């Protein structure tokens, strides 16, 4: 059985920390493939400040094209209406049989998971892989994991990846303040951002 992971997000923009997490996930989980799924209309974020979906898709496609185990899918971008994680997982599990599915998420997602739709469906369809993110208290995180595992299916796994302290929010702020971001994103992504005057 093949092992594949879904890495969803707005990728607004994709940056070096995203790529590091993806590469480390493949290595540590011994994945056959990792699929980047840029969101169309995410339920937990307003549209203000989010670059057009086609440009976010283009940036992810450019950033991952040199890694043969990375793939991009436009399912959420093409889907009309709000994108919910459980629907995305149902789509992939239906369209690709005999796959052991993983879903890559940050600690922020773990802390908010109880607010997501159909959590039991999500945890029944995949192993919910959580990577480190700065700014969270360890005991608080473990307490949340224990609470979720009692309430839902026990399918949450921590992945020990040393976090790179980069966020899309910081990058957008630096762009607005006319600061250099070339060390935070791949060169090709920096070029797309400049060419399309994104986040100014």
UniProtKB/Swiss-Prot annotation:
Pathway: Cofactor biosynthesis; NAD(+) biosynthesis; deamido-NAD(+) from nicotinate D-ribonucleotide: step 1/1. Keywords: ATP-binding, NAD, Nucleotide-binding, Nucleotidyltransferase, Pyridine nucleotide biosynthesis, Transferase. It is an enzyme of class 2 (transferase). Gene3D superfamilies: HUPs. GO terms for biological process: NAD biosynthetic process. It catalyses: nicotinate beta-D-ribonucleotide + ATP + H(+) = deamido-NAD(+) + diphosphate. CDD domains: NMNAT. Its EC number is 2.7.7.18. GO terms for molecular function: ATP binding; nicotinate-nucleotide adenylyltransferase activity. Catalyzes the reversible adenylation of nicotinate mononucleotide (NaMN) to nicotinic acid adenine dinucleotide (NaAD). Belongs to the NadD family. PANTHER family: NICOTINATE-NUCLEOTIDE ADENYLYLTRANSFERASE-RELATED, PHOSPHOPANTETHEINE ADENYLYLTRANSFERASE. NCBIfam families: cyt_tran_rel, nicotinate (nicotinamide) nucleotide adenylyltransferase, PRK00071.1-3. This is Probable nicotinate-nucleotide adenylyltransferase.
């Amino acid at each position: 059985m093949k092992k594949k992971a879904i890495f969803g997000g707005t990728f607004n923009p994709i940056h070096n920390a995203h790529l590091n997490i993806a590469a480390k996930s493949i290595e540590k989980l011994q994945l056959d493939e990792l699929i980047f799924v840029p969101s169309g209309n995410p339920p937990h974020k307003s549209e203000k400040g989010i670059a057009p979906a086609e440009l976010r898709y283009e940036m992810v496609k450019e950033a991952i094209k040199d890694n043969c185990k990375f793939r991009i899918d436009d399912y959420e971008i093409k889907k009309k209406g709000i994108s919910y994680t459980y629907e995305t997982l149902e789509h992939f599990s239906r369209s690709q049989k005999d796959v052991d599915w993983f879903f890559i998420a940050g600690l922020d997602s773990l802390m908010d998971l109880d607010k997501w739709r159909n959590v039991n469906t999500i945890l029944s369809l995949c192993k919910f892989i959580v990577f480190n993110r700065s700014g969270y208290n360890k005991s608080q995180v473990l307490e949340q994991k224990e609470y979720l595992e009692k309430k839902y299916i026990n399918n949450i796994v921590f992945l020990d990846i040393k976090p790179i302290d980069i966020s899309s929010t910081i990058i957008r702020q630096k762009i607005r303040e006319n600061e250099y971001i070339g060390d935070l994103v791949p060169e090709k992504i920096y070029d797309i951002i400049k060419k399309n005057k994104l986040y100014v």
